[in-house]
Regions:
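Amphipathic, hydrophobic secondary-structure cores in small proteins
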Residues: 47-53, 58, 80-85
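Ligand-binding loop in jelly-roll beta-barrel domains
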Residues: 88-116
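Well-ordered beta-strand positions in beta-sheet-rich domains
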Residues: 39, 75-77, 93
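A short, N-terminal "cap"/entry segment at the start of jelly-roll beta-barrel domains
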Residues: 1-38, 119-125
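Conserved short histidine dyad/triad with adjacent acidic residue
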Residues: 22-23, 36-52
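A cytosolic small-molecule/anion-sensing beta-strand core signal
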Residues: 33, 61-62, 79-80, 98
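Short, conserved beta-strand element in jelly-roll/cupin
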Residues: 41-42, 51-71, 105
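Short acidic-glycine-tyrosine-enriched beta hairpin
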Residues: 71-88
Length: 125
């Protein structure tokens, strides 16, 4: 995904998220060294997946965001101004029971479709 913003450009997350009408949206905002910051606007459930080489950090701007951790058998619930990191190799899925805006900080190598091959968007049932 190409970055929407370069260095020395103002990024207004609230304005960007407010313009999103889709139930599932993912945009790379900018690149910082070998990492990217992505904006996610979502409602629904993403499929189970893991990243072999990359860690991820999720930060909630608005809404409610759930991260299910398969091996631990637990769910982490995040509300605005809370964040959580998922280390490489951990099988997880994310859920947003209501419209939720998040920022994701991850390696530029992370494929935002999970393990790859799946469509970007909520899990299919």
């Amino acid at each position: 995904m190409d970055e929407a913003f370069g260095f020395l450009e103002l990024v207004d997350v609230q304005e960007l998220a407010g313009a999103v009408e889709d139930r599932w949206y993912n945009q790379t905002l900018c690149r910082i060294n070998d990492c990217v910051v992505r904006l996610g606007v979502m409602q629904g459930e993403f499929h189970w997946h893991h990243h072999d080489e990359e860690d991820e950090f999720f930060y909630v701007v608005e809404g409610r965001f759930l991260i299910d951790l398969q091996e631990e058998g637990r769910t982490v619930e995040l509300t605005p101004r809370q964040g959580f990191s998922v280390p490489r190799g951990v099988v997880h899925r994310t859920r947003a029971p209501e419209r939720t805006v998040i920022l994701m900080f991850e390696s530029a190598g992370v494929v935002p479709t999970g393990d790859g091959g799946n469509e970007l968007g909520p899990a299919r049932r």
